[in-house]
Each structure stands twice: as structure tokens, then as C-alpha cells.
């Protein structure tokens, strides 16, 4: 085995994405895992699962298991089981929808309850999505930052539509969980806008209206 192979390490992290159904959670997870953006809104029922492997400084390979939890699961019997064992929690809201921000209190209360019963204390990140719609913002940045300071969250603003800061968000969360500091060059390289491709799930318009796509499970090949 070569020195480079010996130095290479592999880790796996469970990242759970929570928030209201229209906050853009699935678009965020899809943008990170596949660098695509689905124009059609599809409600996540229960749970969707995404995978992506990234490399952090120190030749550390990390596979992120991204659990996209359906917005309607709040108060459901399975939510605590989905959250249990997570190393990272992303609380996602739509910056143009104040209610989606207010409802994060309910999501976070579940996280706190589960954390009290778990040996794993997750890193919690507050993610303001849809910054491409800054002109329609209803949640002021100082509200976002105050919520972070009061609860010890890390702070992120992203656009799942343009890809702005999406990879950087997941990269910084993974690095913070593992105690790794990113330098300025690494942050600037990750803070890029990816081209948002429209995902066409069905080539036949008539069939699409009658039989909408039922599966949204995906992983990076």
C-alpha cells in the first residue's frame, strides 16, 4: 500500500434536512448531490435519501448521507427516528416566506428532544434558501443571525436554484463536524454558482399530466 493510500481516510456523516414543505429542502439536497435543479415542485412524502462523496483538507474522503425529511412529518411518529444518530441538522427556510422561518422553532424542538436521548449531539445549521429572490425577502438577515446566536447554530444563505453557496454549505457543515478548518481559497472555490439544469422526469407531456412522477430517490453515480 502506498503512502498516499495509507494517508487517505474515509468517513461517513448523516445529515438530516428539516423544514417546511415549500422551503426548498429537496431542491437543496438535489442541487448538492447532483448539481441539478428540478423546476417542478414535488412534495417529499416521508423521506428521500441522497449521497455524495466529498474530499476535505488532509485527504479526508467523506460520504454525506443526506436525509431529506418531508415537511408534513412534523409531529409524526417517525420524525424522531429519522433524526436519531444524525451528526448534522440543516434547518431550512425560504427567505421569502416568514412562516417557514417561524415554524423552525417546532422543528428544532424535536431535534432538542431527540438529542437529549442520543449520545450524538448534532451540529445544527440554519439555512436561508432562495437568495436569488433577495428582492422578495421577508425574513431579515438580522432575524436569521439572532436565531443562530441564541441557539449556537452555524449560519448559511444559499440558492438551490442557482447553486449559489450550496456545496459550500454542506462542505462547511461536514468540516465543522469533523473539526477541520477551511482556508479562504477553499471557501472561495466552493462558493460558486452552478448551472441549474431543468430535470425532465417524463418526455411525454400528456403522460406527465396524467401520471406524475412518483419516485424522487436518487444518488450520485
Curated annotation (Swiss-Prot):
One of its GO terms (cellular component) is cytoplasm. Disruption phenotype: Knockout mice are viable and fertile. Cone cells have elongated outer segments (OS) and enlarged OS tips. Knockout mice exhibit reduced cone and rod electroretinography responses and progressive retina degeneration. Cone phagosomes are almost absent, whereas rod phagosomes display normal levels. Prenylated. Gene3D superfamilies: P-loop containing nucleotide triphosphate hydrolases. Pfam families: Ras. It comes from the Eukaryota. InterPro entries: P-loop_NTPase, Small_GTP-bd, Small_GTPase. Switch I, switch II and the interswitch regions are characteristic of Rab GTPases and mediate the interactions with Rab downstream effectors. The switch regions undergo conformational changes upon nucleotide binding which drive interaction with specific sets of effector proteins, with most effectors only binding to GTP-bound Rab. Interacts (prenylated form) with PDE6D; the interaction promotes RAB28 delivery to the photoreceptor outer segments. Interacts with KCNJ13; the interaction may facilitate cone outer segments phagocytosis. Also participates in nuclear factor kappa-B p65/RELA nuclear transport in endothelial cells. This is Ras-related protein Rab-28. It comes from Mus musculus.
Amino acid at each position: 500500500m502506498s503512502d498516499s493510500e495509507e494517508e487517505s481516510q474515509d468517513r461517513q456523516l448523516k445529515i438530516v434536512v428539516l423544514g417546511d414543505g415549500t422551503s426548498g429542502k429537496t431542491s437543496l439536497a438535489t442541487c448538492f448531490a447532483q448539481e441539478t435543479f428540478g423546476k417542478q415542485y414535488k412534495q417529499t412524502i416521508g423521506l428521500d435519501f441522497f449521497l455524495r462523496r466529498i474530499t476535505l483538507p488532509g485527504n479526508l474522503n467523506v460520504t454525506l448521507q443526506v436525509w431529506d425529511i418531508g415537511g408534513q412529518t412534523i409531529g409524526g411518529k417517525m420524525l424522531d427516528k429519522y433524526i436519531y444518530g444524525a451528526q448534522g441538522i440543516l434547518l431550512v427556510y425560504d427567505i421569502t416566506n416568514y412562516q417557514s422561518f417561524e415554524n423552525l422553532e417546532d422543528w428544532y424542538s424535536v431535534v432538542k428532544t431527540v438529542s437529549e436521548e442520543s449520545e450524538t449531539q448534532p451540529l445544527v445549521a440554519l439555512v436561508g434558501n432562495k437568495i436569488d429572490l433577495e428582492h422578495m425577502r421577508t425574513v431579515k438577515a438580522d432575524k436569521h443571525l439572532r436565531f443562530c446566536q441564541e441557539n449556537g447554530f452555524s449560519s448559511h444563505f444559499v440558492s438551490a436554484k442557482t447553486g449559489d453557496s450550496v456545496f459550500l454549505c454542506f462542505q462547511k457543515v461536514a468540516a465543522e463536524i469533523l473539526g477541520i478548518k477551511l482556508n479562504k481559497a477553499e471557501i472561495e472555490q466552493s462558493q460558486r454558482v452552478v448551472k441549474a439544469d431543468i430535470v425532465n422526469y417524463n418526455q411525454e407531456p400528456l403522460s406527465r399530466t396524467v401520471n406524475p412522477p412518483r419516485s424522487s430517490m436518487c444518488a450520485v453515480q
